[in-house]
Amino acid sequence: MEKVPMTTAGFETLKEELRWRQQQERPRIIEAISEARAHGDLSENAEYHAAKEAQSYNEGRINELEDYIARAEVIDVSRLSGNQIKFGATVKLLNEDTEEKKVYQIVGDQEADVKIGKISISSPIARALIGKEEGDVIEVNAPGGAHNYEIIKIQYI
């Protein structure tokens, strides 16, 4: 069974979503199915079909969450240190083309959200950063072309 790296915060978020889906969403959907059944003929009952579809999605997501949680390799980023970039690092970069500064934390696939600065360990930019140090310059091939970034700061917070 392949381990899935994730931060402590990411692990807690997955556990909370699992709890919500099992304890709140599942009973709500069961109630919706029951109500829709009470309306009679199921073959043309849109409410029933929508509730069954929601149930299928919810149960699939529960199975997925249980799998990720079972395979989680939880890494407490606050206990990490070092000069090289590894999983969990928060990295400040300077785009050498635009002079724009960006801050990213390298996280597990399930917790990645680029809008809040969390990039997946398997993303092209994270793969280019792993093992590098402050002052190094990396080249990232993105859909819009290649970009050069200078690593300004590495933190484990």
Curated annotation (Swiss-Prot):
InterPro entries: GreA/GreB_C_sf (IPR036953), TF_GreA/GreB_CS (IPR018151), Tscrpt_elong_fac_GreA (IPR006359), Tscrpt_elong_fac_GreA/B (IPR028624), Tscrpt_elong_fac_GreA/B_C (IPR001437), Tscrpt_elong_fac_GreA/B_fam (IPR023459), Tscrpt_elong_fac_GreA/B_N (IPR022691), Tscrpt_elong_fac_GreA/B_N_sf (IPR036805). Keywords: DNA-binding, Transcription, Transcription regulation. One of its GO terms (molecular function) is DNA binding. GO terms for biological process: DNA-templated transcription elongation; regulation of DNA-templated transcription elongation. Coiled coil: none annotated. Necessary for efficient RNA polymerase transcription elongation past template-encoded arresting sites. The arresting sites in DNA have the property of trapping a certain fraction of elongating RNA polymerases that pass through, resulting in locked ternary complexes. Cleavage of the nascent transcript by cleavage factors such as GreA or GreB allows the resumption of elongation from the new 3'terminus. GreA releases sequences of 2 to 3 nucleotides. Belongs to the GreA/GreB family. This is Transcription elongation factor GreA. It comes from Bartonella bacilliformis (strain ATCC 35685 / KC583 / Herrer 020/F12,63).
